[in-house]
Amino acid sequence: MPHAFKPGDLVFAKMKGYPHWPARIDDIADGAVKPPPNKYPIFFFGTHETAFLGPKDLFPYDKCKDKYGKPNKRKGFNEGLWEIQNNPHASYSAPLPVSSSDSEAPEADLGGGSDADKEKEARRVMTVTAVTTTATSGRTESDSDSDKNSDHSGLKRKTPVLKMSVSKRARKASSDLDQASVSPSEEDSESPSESEKTSDQDFTPEKKTIARAPRRAPLGGRKKKKVPSASDSDSRADSDGAKEEPVVTAQPSPSSSSSSSSSSASDSDVSIKKPPRGRKPAEKPPPKPRGRRSKPERPPSTSSSDSDSDSGEVDRISEWKRRDEERRRELEARRRREQEEELRRLREQEREEKERRKERAERGGSSGEELEDEEPVKKRSRKARGRGTPSSSDSEPEGELGKEGKKLAKKSQLQGSESARKPGQKEKRGRPDEKPRARPVKVERTRKRSEGLSLDRKGEKKKEPSVEERLQKLHSEIKFALKVDNPDVRRCLSALEELGTLQVTSQILQKNTDVVATLKKIRRYKANKDVMAKAAEVYTRLKSRVLGPKVEALQKVNKAGAEKERADGEKVEEQPGEQAPRELAEDEPSTDRSAPVNGEAASQKGENTEDGAQEDGQDLEDGPRGGSSEELHDSPQDSSDPARPGNEHQDHERMQLASESADDDDEDS
């Protein structure tokens, strides 16, 4: 069951991102923001921040002292443990009722009041500022990461009453406000009192903490209207050193003090708002606040020492930042110097390369020894670069320029020595210099020849592989050689011979039927008998390759009796012309019945059309199509078993083919 708490109870409060913090259940001041239901206003010791938390996040101090009361690294936590034990009523927000004497005290001070009052108020301000510096330095450094989670955790400030006083006091005459703003500035600048010195010392570290913890600004709470009141209270405490009450009420968190002290020019605005805050509590006479005011005076020495130590830490941090900035500047300067040096070196190298190219162009053929001389120069330049890079980062640019000048001098000396060697070498060589110039020409010629041969070989290799291409090429050559206007017999004979040597398959002939047709036509080329004979020979070769070797043997055997059986063969030619398939003969009548071939009369061509059509039909069946289906399939069977009774018709067809070939040979002869 959650514990019921009362105002003034000491507890450990748990907020997101923070350990169980020593805190106190606070009173709700008149006019202050009321907490939501089931939540208590909490005052955190050490940091002096306020928040609204539920009972589940609150743990009694006495019961949980051993569990949560252990020292922690978080700055402000150990101070909170000390405060909850030694000063449980500590508070920056002074109670609202203040006596008239207290409210009139700041006005008396502005007009030059008693010295005793000034000293008392100065001591109070010292204690307040000391605690603020400790809180700011601790909370900003340790909780910079956890602040993002706790930005919206519900921290509030107890300064709404002071805001109302500002609105009431805003009607005061401008002359009084100007006097109030001028008097504290003059006191801070001219009076050498110890209280003012301490206030200045406390004010400077607050300014320095701004650079460290600008992120703490949103931690102050959800209401941004109260931030200027906190800044006014801090600057007022540092400038006047005489108004402790308004400073206490308006000091809600270290974040507000750090953000408010960022601008030193806000002193004038602070002085304008001082009198309204001093007079607002004058309406409420109860003298209770004095008892609480005396309590913060107990540990003034410790708070002042803490403020001094914090200011020293801030000074150290600022020194470290300055050193870091100086180092960064030095590094940037070194980088710039190195970049400039690299650019200079690159430019020098480019110039040297250009000079070397010019020298090489002038020298011409004799470049062997020059390359040998250039290699040590490159090595030296590389060594010089290796030496120059580490020294450039440490040495000044003037020393670097001096080193670069030395390098250039060395390079110029080396170039001078090379130029001095050249005339001696030329004198020694004399005429032999001309010979190496002539040699490259011969080498180039040999290279060109070898390249030409290699190209020819490549061309031959490309032509060799494809048989179809050669067949088509020879076909075109034969057609071109047997033109009517200018026939070239030798070229035609050579092409026919090459065509006979080609290893042609039946598939290739089926694709290229035009070749077979032209060979048939050339067999009747009467302008030259050699062409006719060669064409007939090539035609028979192709036919034998397609039909098989046994057909050739039968033809040779039957050649002897071909002359005797001419008459019978002519009669029999009509029968196979009717029986044999005439598909190819019908497909190619146009080729045989086309215009007369070279030197052949139309009448002669017409006489031979009937016989030629039959012969061509059978030949085409045998040649490109591999013969008729019956002949091709039955020929191996006939050779294996010629005595079979069913093969008489096939034997008769073979005899006819043999007789036809014999007749063709006789006609050609």
From Swiss-Prot:
Expressed in the spinal cord (at protein level). Primarily restricted to neurons, astrocytes and oligodendrocytes and is particularly expressed in motor neurons of the anterior horn (at protein level). Significantly up-regulated in the injured spinal cord (at protein level). There is a cross-link at K550 (Glycyl lysine isopeptide (Lys-Gly) (interchain with G-Cter in SUMO2)). Residues 466-548 are annotated as: Interaction with DPF3/BAF45C isoform 2. Residues 155-172 have a biased composition (Basic residues). GO terms for biological process: chromatin remodeling; DNA recombination; DNA repair; DNA repair-dependent chromatin remodeling; muscle cell differentiation; muscle organ development; positive regulation of cell growth; positive regulation of double-strand break repair via homologous recombination. Its main location: nucleus. Residues 609-621 have a biased composition (Acidic residues). Residues 115-124, 140-154, 194-209, 233-246, 313-363, 419-469, 561-584, 622-636, 646-655 have a biased composition (Basic and acidic residues). GO terms for molecular function: histone H3K27me3 reader activity; histone H3K9me2/3 reader activity; histone reader activity; methylated histone binding. The modification Phosphoserine is found at residues 114, 137, 165, 229, 231, 233, 239, 268, 307, 366-367, 391-393, 395, 450, 454, 628-629, 635, 640, 659, 661, 669. Residues 7-64 form the PWWP domain. GO terms for cellular component: cytoplasm; nucleus. InterPro entries: HIVI-bd_sf, LEDGF_IBD, PWWP_dom, TFIIS/LEDGF_dom_sf. The modification Phosphothreonine is found at T609. Residues 92-469, 558-669 are annotated as: Disordered. It is found in: Nucleus; Cytoplasm. Keywords: Coiled coil, Cytoplasm, DNA damage, DNA recombination, DNA repair, Isopeptide bond, Myogenesis, Nucleus, Phosphoprotein, Ubl conjugation. Residues 125-139, 252-269 have a biased composition (Low complexity). Acts as an epigenetic regulator of myogenesis in cooperation with DPF3a (isoform 2 of DPF3/BAF45C). Associates with the BAF complex via its interaction with DPF3a and HDGFL2-DPF3a activate myogenic genes by increasing chromatin accessibility through recruitment of SMARCA4/BRG1/BAF190A (ATPase subunit of the BAF complex) to myogenic gene promoters. Promotes the repair of DNA double-strand breaks (DSBs) through the homologous recombination pathway by facilitating the recruitment of the DNA endonuclease RBBP8 to the DSBs. Belongs to the HDGF family. Interacts with HDGF. Interacts with trimethylated 'Lys-36' of histone H3 (H3K36me3). Interacts with trimethylated 'Lys-79' of histone H3 (H3K79me3), but has higher affinity for H3K36me3. Interacts with IWS1. Interacts with H2AX, POGZ, RBBP8 and CBX1. Interacts with histones H3K9me3, H3K27me3 and H3K36me2. Interacts with DPF3a (isoform 2 of DPF3/BAF45C). Interacts with SMARCA4/BRG1/BAF190A, SMARCC1/BAF155 and SMARCD1/BAF60A in a DPF3a-dependent manner. This is Hepatoma-derived growth factor-related protein 2. It comes from Rattus norvegicus.
